[in-house]
Amino acid sequence: MIAVSYHDRVNVLQSLPLASATPFERAEWFSLLAEEGGLSPFVVLAQDGSEAIALPLMREGGALVPLANWYSFSWGPLATPDADRPALLTAIACDLARKTHRITFAPIPEEDEAASGLAAAFRAGGWAVLEETCDTNHILRVEGRSYEAYLASRPGQLRTTLKRKAKKVEVGVLSCFDPEVWRAYQEIYANSWKPAEGKPAMLRRFAEQEGAAGRLRLGIARHEGRAIAAQFWTVENATAYIHKLAHVEEAVPLSAGTVLTAAMFAQAIDGDRVDLVDFGTGDDPYKGIWMEETRRRIRLDCHRPGHPTSWPHLARATVRKLASRPRAV
């Protein structure tokens, strides 16, 4: 028999053998979001014997949303390897009707059927589910190539830039956490075009954890001894994740950011032998220079159709759907 329970601490995730393929599916990540990110967990757990599935959520206004922030590339249900996902998710969907009238799930990966599984379960549980694309994920499938072969497939302008500028910049890539290098990264980020770091303590603690586990790849580019560009990557399960990158204005004439990116790709492809490079969310044009494929990120907006506050949302969705239909000639 399936039992559904609710928890205001993420500790419950640590006691379960939940499968985690990405940094954003580990219990430690949700602990960081709660402890350093300042978020208040609302974890929904369905269990049937040894089978379990969890939805790490939080309250936002009158709705439930994923326990996530801007550092999270994606979000999805966490399950034990043998879990009956449809049955457990449907049980959660039915029970959540007692807790809220609206739940928004995003950004959900398109490629692993998490979005379709959630949508089917919540529709079976009596929810009206609105689905849309909310973001874009740029990736590179290495497909056994060496870095040299990969670089040969890049645009000619990029290869020319690297030939002209590579010798003017010194690059280093660390796989362990170094406080001095991290301070250099923070200084570069603070003086770059990027907005102020939202949760610097959380990001540092994440970097420390990844460094202790051997997953950190922290790159720094220097010119005449001064750090002018930095990138924060991690490597896990044959995938390299590009978390943060920044450079100061003085780095632009030297193309230091480009030179550092090339060094990071070389480390990931030839050094770490990854199968995939994940550039996170955001459809920035520069990502297309390095990456070869995009994947959709999905938003599911789930409403209880009998609740009055749901009616305006459902009405607007109906109007948009009708307006998008081709008109008869």
Short names for language-model regions:
Residues 69-111:
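A gly/proline- and charged-residue-enriched helix-loop-helix capping module
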Residues 59, 120-149, 272-329:
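Active-site/acyl-donor-binding loops of N-acyltransferases
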Residues 39-41, 98-102, 216, 272-274:
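Short, high-confidence coil segments that cap the C-terminus of an alpha-helix
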Residues 72, 90-94, 193-312:
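Aromatic (often tryptophan-rich) hydrophobic motifs at membrane interfaces
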Residues 33-36, 94-97, 128-131, 268-269, ...:
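A general structural signal for short secondary-structure junctions and capping/turn motifs
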Residues 2-64, 107-137, 141-253:
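A conserved beta-strand-loop-helix scaffold within acyl/acetyltransferase catalytic domains
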Residues 105-115, 278-285:
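Conserved beta-strand-loop-alpha-helix junction that forms the acyl-donor binding cleft
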